[in-house]
Amino acid sequence: APTAFYGVR
């Protein structure tokens, strides 16, 4: 998943 949207997940 793109870090720019989710950060950390």
From Swiss-Prot:
Q: What is this protein called?
A: Callitachykinin-1
What the protein does comes down to: Myoactive peptide.
List GO terms (cellular component aspect): extracellular region
Q: Which residues carry this modification: Arginine amide?
A: 9
The UniProt entry lists the main location of this chain as: secreted
GO terms (BP aspect): neuropeptide signaling pathway
- Cellular localization per UniProt: Secreted
Q: What are the UniProt keywords, alphabetically?
A: Amidation, Neuropeptide, Secreted
Q: Which domain of life is it from?
A: Eukaryota
